[in-house]
Regions:
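An N-terminal assembly and electron-transfer interface module characteristic of large anaerobic redox
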Residues: 1-545
Length: 545
């Protein structure tokens, strides 16, 4: 089955999406193994949306009745029994986790939280890591066995929590950072892009709460027992050394006649200062601060220039025009190429999708140019709440800006809810959305005309010049008079494109370009594949945006 949505099990109401990769597994199996064709075995791949328990019951009753002629009353009994079994299992798991935690606290030891996806419970996937840890004498807890995990406040995470497994990993990281008796290990397999932003955020949260560092392991099908043992042993030795220093510091602080102030340094080489600042920090647990402390306020509409990265340059221009209709000083960025890619690779996790790297790289390249004052600049970034990594571009951008030395740059998105309060001074309104929706088909048509004409133009470069002028008509009309202005501009744009001289008497072979959304339309990201193919004798067909 493909389960697209499931109810939240934590404090975040948005954590209803299921993994986009896992949702596609039935299609992968059907196309790769073809059980119907190869063995004549029926292959069912029903699609379910279980936002509530009632949804699950209703959809399963319908599926079982239509597919297997099972009576609704029988299916309802089975669903209730399954729910009861899951509740009992969850209770036993929490009890076992509480027992382990109680024991290590009593004995002054520590346990390790193994944060992973469900498939990483398989010994073939995790390379028997749980057994390796217990071999070293360290108890192991799964994230969902940690007591209180469902009640952890995740509002100060940079991420929008859209998945229950993400919530488990983040919440268990918070609890591990807050406890002297818990440490943290995260599994990552096949360079999962969703785990990439989780790894970044887990490290940030744990470091800010108590100075702890997690162990992040990338485990795939290759033989890793030797390197894995070394990594785990090094991690445990680091923890043991830190705990010994902590015990020494506590003994020094508790010595009769020795004040806390003396132990904080003050020339006393035997004080806790001699143990290092990282150890001193680990004594204290801090509340997470606002991860987006720099806001786009109302006054920033006049103060800040908003830089808009590209999907396609045409879309970037109409997005900027739509923002201008709401009083935003929006500037469409030039299409990023090698420098943008380099900066994106440098400041964005390399396991995240390439589109995130290129659009963030474009913003960083613009800031590096010296053309914009950081304190008077904001970056406009696309966003929606769901299972695509686009949900987390603003979090990736915030980290990249901070790491690159631009913490004063604000972020603005098209998210009308703005859960993290990035831009209290701006909400994209319905009229702007309507203007964008109306302008999108216009640029689709203009780009399609460009692709039909450019390979056959009589004057080299005339098609690109006409397209730029045609876009000016649409953008200026949208900016000055909204949708009606864009429509009038579009009519002029069509006339301008029709004025190009071309000869299609000898049609070229046509090539369809298909791929990841941004790579299709972004010439810097796809290394000008359209022009390359046109120079080599082809006409391009492109999916419409």
């Amino acid at each position: 089955p493909s389960i697209a949505a499931i109810g939240s099990e934590n404090t975040e109401s948005t954590s209803e999406s299921m993994c986009a990769v896992v949702k596609g597994y039935p299609l992968v199996i059907r196309n790769s193994d073809s059980p119907e064709k190869q063995w004549g075995i029926p292959f069912d791949a029903p699609l379910f949306y279980w936002y509530r328990e009632e949804d699950k019951e209703r959809q399963l009753i319908t599926y079982m009745e239509q597919t297997f002629s099972i009576q609704p009353s029988e299916t309802k009994k089975a669903v209730l029994a399954g729910n009861d079994a899951m509740r009992q299992f969850g209770s036993r798991l929490k009890e076992a986790g509480a027992k382990v935690l109680e024991e290590v606290e009593k004995e002054g030891r520590y346990a390790v939280v193994l944060a992973s996806r469900p498939y990483q419970n398989d010994a073939l996937v995790n390379h028997s890591l749980p057994e390796l840890l217990t071999e070293f004498g360290v108890p192991v807890l799964t994230a969902d066995s940690v007591p209180g995990i469902e009640n952890v406040d995740l509002s100060h995470s940079r991420l929008d929590v859209v998945n229950n497994y993400h919530a488990r990993m983040l919440a268990s990281a918070v609890l591990a950072a807050q406890s002297q008796n818990l440490e943290y290990v995260q599994f990552v397999s096949f360079g999962c892009g969703h785990d990439a932003y989780l790894s970044d955020e887990i490290q940030r949260m744990m470091r800010e709460i108590s100075g702890k560092s997690p162990l992040i392991l990338k485990l795939d099908e290759s033989e890793v027992q030797g390197p894995l043992r070394i990594r785990v042993r090094s991690f445990l030795e680091t923890i043991n050394m830190r705990r010994k220093k902590r015990e020494m510091a506590e003994r020094l602080q508790n010595q009769p006649g020795t004040s806390r102030q003396e132990n904080a340094g003050g020339g006393n080489e035997c004080g806790t200062a001699a143990l290092g600042p990282d150890i001193q920090k680990s004594w204290q647990v801090h509340e997470l601060s606002d991860p987006y402390s720099v806001k786009f306020e109302v006054e920033d509409r006049k103060k800040r220039t908003v830089l808009v990265p590209n999907t396609s340059h045409a879309f970037c221009r109409i997005m900027s025009a739509a923002l201008k209709t709401q009083g935003i000083r929006a500037v469409p960025l030039a299409v990023g190429r090698e420098e943008a890619i380099r900066l994106g690779k440098q400041y964005v996790h390399n396991d995240i999708c390439f589109p995130a790297q290129i659009v963030i790289g474009e913003a960083l390249a613009a800031l590096r140019s010296g053309q914009y004052v950081p304190s008077e600049t904001a970056i406009g970034m696309g966003k929606y709440i769901g299972d695509c990594r686009l949900t987390h571009y603003s979090a990736l951008l915030r980290k990249a800006l901070n790491d690159a030395g631009y913490p004063e740059v604000a972020i603005l998105t098209n998210d009308d809810v703005d859960y993290h309060d990035l831009h209290p001074g701006f909400r994209m309104n319905l009229m702007s959305a309507i203007r964008l929706a109306g302008a999108l088909p216009m640029i689709d048509i203009l780009e399609e005309l460009l692709r039909k004409i450019r390979p056959y133009e009589k004057v080299s470069g005339s098609s690109d010049q006409a397209f730029d002028e045609a876009m000016d008509f649409v953008v200026d009309g949208l900016e000055q008079h909204g949708f009606s202005g864009a429509l009038r501009g579009f009519k002029k744009a069509i006339q301008r494109m029709n004025a190009i001289e071309y000869d299609r008497s000898q049609p070229r072979p046509r090539v369809l370009i298909i791929g990841e959304y941004l790579l299709n339309f972004h010439p810097g990201a796809n290394h000008e594949i359209e022009r390359y193919l046109e120079k080599n004798g082809f006409e391009i067909i492109e999916a419409r945006m």
